[in-house]
Amino acid sequence: MPQMDPRALKATSVKAEDEHASSAEPQALKITAASSNPKMFTLPWHKPLATWPEDLLANLPRGISRHVVRFVHVGDEVYAMKEITRQVAEREYEILRRLQKLELPTVIPIAVVTGRHDLNGEPLEAILVTRHLKFSLPYRALFARNLQPDTAERLIDALAVLLVRLHLAGFYWGDVSLSNVLFLRDADAFSAFLVDAETGDLQAQLTDGQREYDIDLARTNIIGELMDLASGKLLPGDVDEIEVGNRLVDRYHSLWSALTDTDKFSPDEMWKIEQRVNKLNDL
């Protein structure tokens, strides 16, 4: 039976409970973090995140989220803060910590803040804190900048690489989309970073069914996101949304096959080894 990478097991730092289980909220403010930033204690945790004062906020492009998200100045750093339930915040913090231990491209988890109450004593949702990835952009901000015509294809290629790396590590995403990724320019290409692990699960090894579910969901979500861009006149007219969605599936399978297929070579078939190395380099 496949064993989980011991690096991931050592990363657990929060006892994350089942999000459907009922348990009492902490009565006092609690900041759980791998390392402390004293400035964290000066923030207005007693206020809903949507009402935090403008002088604390960093004006950075935000992707689409079903939760309240803000970029906040904390000393010399900028943190992304997401307001969610305590169980979900603790679980996502733990998963991100484990993915970081595996040296996978994700945002860096900083803290989870629980036990928040307003001045009237009413409970507020928890906040997950991650470090803002410098120079990164959500996909909508990239398309708003009138980039090259092949931008969509290059973003898809980056997402395919990210998805393969996560799957090889045993991470089932459960909500693959352009919205849950940040992109960094990497010469003429892009690098993709996981930014939302809310629905994810880290296992010793994924089944083919789990991988295919992620891929199929990614294709569906990407086509929908690109159609949304097209309706807002942000997508070049010659881009076929369905073709781009299919490209992710093709690129994923090509890369997965190149990395995981086993071949047998006889001593006089060195050219086959060269051929495989060249294929990996091309991918």
Please report, for each region that a protein language model flagged, where it lies by residue.
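Juxta-kinase regulatory segment immediately upstream of eukaryotic protein kinase catalytic domains
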Residues: 2-58
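Hydrophobic residue at the +6 position relative to the catalytic HRD Asp in the kinase catalytic loop
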Residues: 176, 181-183
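Short, low-complexity Ser/Thr-rich regulatory SLiMs
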Residues: 116, 183-187
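Catalytic cores of secreted or luminal carbohydrate-active enzymes
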Residues: 268, 272
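Long, charge-rich C-terminal accessory regions
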Residues: 274-283
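Conserved ATP-binding subdomain of kinase catalytic cores across diverse folds
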Residues: 40-153, 157-174, 221-223, 228-229
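Beta-sheet entry/capping signal
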Residues: 127, 180, 191-192
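C-lobe/activation-segment region of protein kinase-like
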Residues: 190-261, 265
